[in-house]
């Protein structure tokens, strides 16, 4: 199964993620591809991590990218 990670920053980040998750076609595609990753909310400067690898989308808000990466299980290589 393909896994894709994408990163979005800027003021439109939340809107972009909403479009991805609210659009039925894209949501189906996201479930199929198991999207996960994080983006910076340009309005609050919070880091939002999202993980759909379990079949439904889990999201958490963090202060730092490092916290988001830890939640997602990234390993620095």
Go through each PLM region and give its residues:
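N-terminal non-globular leader segments, chiefly Sec-dependent signal peptides
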Residues: 3-13
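Short intrinsically disordered terminal tails
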Residues: 1-4, 66, 70-77
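Glycine-centered secondary-structure boundary/capping sites
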Residues: 5-6, 18, 24, 73
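Acidic, low-complexity, intrinsically disordered interaction modules
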Residues: 14-66
